[in-house]
Amino acid sequence: MVLFILVLYTCIQDGNGLLCGYISFSNTPMTSAKCWIGTVCFSIPCSFLVHFHCSSLHLFSNCFLHRSFSPHLMPRTSISTLGQLFEPTITHNGIPMACDNFILAPIPSFSLNWSRMSFCKFCMVGSFSSSDLTSCNLCEFSGLFGPVQIDTLYGAIIAGHLNPLESRPSSAIAPTSLLTPMP
């Protein structure tokens, strides 16, 4: 079998600088690969690999989703805030988990029409190279790195480390000032 890999690199300029992402698809088998993203339903027999960064190059820190990306879904909000929102829905091996140290970036529709971008959410267990990805809601993708779930509810891609709630350092908890939308 010929290995097929497609890599998309995207960047968007916003008030905080460039928001960029790598989106990779390969033709390794998947047990489940069908998901609604926005108004696009797609089914792909491939693994879904994602790596994102922000222009500040501070991975997993201080990245923001600008309101102009998806104003009807959320205001510009810190990723730490989003982590607080998602905590109750995340489990790993039956253990409640907390999403820390988030990054995010947009996935465009296949037409690459930036006026109709779609966003998904990811949470990861362990380091970025972990072989065990987990969580969040909706649309499960099983591929090279194990189960990955995509959630379009909040209109954002979110990737970060998952840790048991009881072992989560206090410094990872969002300050109260981040729990309200930013102007």
UniProtKB/Swiss-Prot annotation:
The keyword Signal applies. It comes from Saccharomyces cerevisiae (strain ATCC 204508 / S288c). Residues 1-17 form the signal peptide. This is Putative uncharacterized protein YER087C-A. Partially overlaps AIM10. Keywords: Signal.
